[in-house]
Amino acid sequence: MSKKTKQELENNKLSKRLRHAVGDTINDFNMIEPGDKIMVCLSGGKDSYALLDILRRLQASAPIDFELVAVNLDQKQPGFPEEVLPTYLESIGVPYKIVEEDTYSTVKRVLDEGKTTCSLCSRLRRGILYRTAKELGCTKIALGHHRDDILATMFLNMFYGGKLKAMPPKLVSDNGEHIVIRPLAYVKEKDLIKYAELKQFPIIPCNLCGSQPNLQRQVIGDMLRDWDKRFPGRIESMFSALQNVVPSHLADTELFDFAGLERGQNLKHGGDLAFDSEKMPERFSDGSEEDESEIKIEPQKAERKVINILANKPKTCGP
């Protein structure tokens, strides 16, 4: 096999792996429904480019119809190349809206020199995006956070907030008016890096965030990447833990009735067994065969009509 053919095979495996991971996420959390108009938040980074690209490919073959509209918030950061995103979106034929709001000056004016800007910047950005989704009549807001972002958020909340809380794949917005989805929730960041290189997305660096190398999130990210190198499978096990929560073995009295616990009570996950040594699911293993398998970790959910986003559109017969 030639080097070129081998690379093409690897690229094809990567594309299939990402498509299946995103499709599984959408299916597991019922993220997209018939007739949805989805606002894809496009920052110019690798994650949001990949999100839009994969959703477009699913849209072309899915058994249901839904719309996509890309939205970019131009925060008026110095040196931001305003022409890059419109040129790219017009070249691929995706409807889009560029929202111009000078949040950069607001953040710089309000925060002291040297303070991290992410928290305030994020709050300002959310409000503008919620307003834009309403103006466009969108039913869902799609964000580009991936598996590693979700785990990093969990550790940030544990280390600095005293909460066992991560970043949900699907939620209701702060103002209660929108459904926010994260279709990349099952996707590894390292796969997104490879995909961005493969697709040659016109990446736009964030000068505001990128100029703050000592951010807590960056430190946590470095920790996770180090673990991934030194302890293969640890990241996969941690994400699996987010889908296998056992309230009776934690310490939150709001989640489990410890006060009403009685002898002989039949607990769903057992009583005194604190460590389970069962083999972890291999959805996120590094082997390509496992990545494309049918192994699933099903979240508990109410009965509903299941639509497989990975199924093909029904064929129509001619007259």
Swiss-Prot record:
SS bond list: none
Compositional bias of kind Basic and acidic residues: 276-286
Binding residues annotated for [4Fe-4S] cluster, in chain numbering: C118, C121, C209
Cofactor entry: Mg(2+); [4Fe-4S] cluster
Ribosomal protein keyword on record: no
A Pfam family recorded for this sequence: ATP_bind_3
UniProt record similarity statement: Belongs to the TtcA family.
One GO biological process term: tRNA thio-modification
Source species: Neisseria gonorrhoeae (strain ATCC 700825 / FA 1090)
UniProt-listed Enzyme Commission number(s): 2.8.1.-
Motif PP-loop motif positions after renumbering to this chain: 43-48
Gene of this entry: ttcA
Name by which UniProt lists this protein: tRNA-cytidine(32) 2-sulfurtransferase
A GO CC term assigned to this protein in UniProt: cytoplasm
